[in-house]
Curated annotation (Swiss-Prot):
Lineage, broadest ranks: Bacteria, Pseudomonadati, Pseudomonadota, Gammaproteobacteria, Thiotrichales
Binding annotation for Mg(2+): 40, 111, 114
Gene giving rise to this polypeptide: rnc
Active site: 44, 114
Catalyzed reactions: Endonucleolytic cleavage to 5'-phosphomonoester
Protein source organism: Francisella tularensis subsp. tularensis (strain SCHU S4 / Schu 4)
Boundaries of every RNase III domain copy: 5-125
Swiss-Prot/TrEMBL cofactor(s): Mg(2+)
GO molecular function: double-stranded RNA binding; metal ion binding; ribonuclease III activity; rRNA binding
PROSITE patterns found in the cross-reference section: DS_RBD (PS50137), RNASE_3_1 (PS00517), RNASE_3_2 (PS50142)
Name of the featured protein: Ribonuclease 3
Cellular localisation: Cytoplasm
Length: 230
């Protein structure tokens, strides 16, 4: 065990055999080309499957659509960032000079959380990483209130409105990215060809900007008499 990471291992509930995997998982691209991005990709898939499986087994009467909404809620940025902070990951993130001050940035915390999962998977096996993930998520999963999944995010709600009215889904694209790496502002444009609508909004991440864009389009559809059918 590397001494400076012994406390972190205890917090994670996992001891790395190959600590270089953990270093890679904590390293932002601003520091070096050997960063967490590939591990993040792997961890995202592992996490999504583990959460999907536990929800499938725990909520046996829940329909597929509701399971998808609940999984989305559990693996979205805010939840991952909160878990990363509770596990003190922000204290160990390795950033380059251009990203100093970004330890608390939600997108970075989200990415590192997924990267650490990917690193644990490569360092051990699926059964082990699943056990670790479920330990981290236990307080959240045990307190799930099924009523909360009735609340859809704006993109999902917009999608349902359009599909219910036999309209094609909007196309989202990034128009601009402004600001320094740790305080970027994304401008996203959503286009509905069927309705000849073009809407834009800003957010501190692409996901947030897309949600705000969807909110605006929902408001415009409402003015035209298009609402979600219950």
């Amino acid at each position: 065990m590397v001494p400076e990471y012994s406390r972190f291992y205890n917090i994670l509930g996992y001891n790395f055999k190959d600590y270089t995997l953990l270093i890679r998982a904590l390293t932002h691209r601003s520091k070096t080309k050997k960063n967490y991005e590939r591990l993040e990709f792997l961890g995202d898939s592992v996490l999504s499957f583990v959460i999907a499986e536990v929800l499938y087994k725990q909520f046996i009467d829940l329909a597929e659509g509701k399971l998808s909404q609940l999984r989305s809620k559990l693996v979205k940025g805010a939840t991952l960032a909160q878990l990363a902070s509770s596990l003190k990951m922000d204290e160990y993130i390795i950033l380059g000079a251009s990203e100093q001050g970004g330890h608390k940035r939600e997108k970075i915390l989200e990415d590192v959380f997924e990267a650490v999962i990917g690193a644990i998977y490569l360092d051990s096996d699926f059964a082990t990483v699943k056990k670790v993930i479920l330990k981290w998520y236990q307080p959240i999963i045990s307190s799930i209130n099924l009523d909360t999944i009735k609340v859809k995010d704006s993109k999902s709600k917009l999608q349902e409105i359009l599909l219910q009215n036999a309209l094609s889904l909007p196309e989202y694209s990034i128009e601009t990215i402004d600001g320094k790496d740790h305080e970027q502002q994304f401008t996203v444009v959503a286009v509905s060809k069927d309705l000849n609508l073009r809407v834009k909004a800003q957010g501190t991440s692409r996901k947030k900007a897309e949600q705000k864009t969807a909110e605006k389009m929902i408001e415009m559809l409402s003015q035209q008499g298009l609402h979600e059918k219950k």
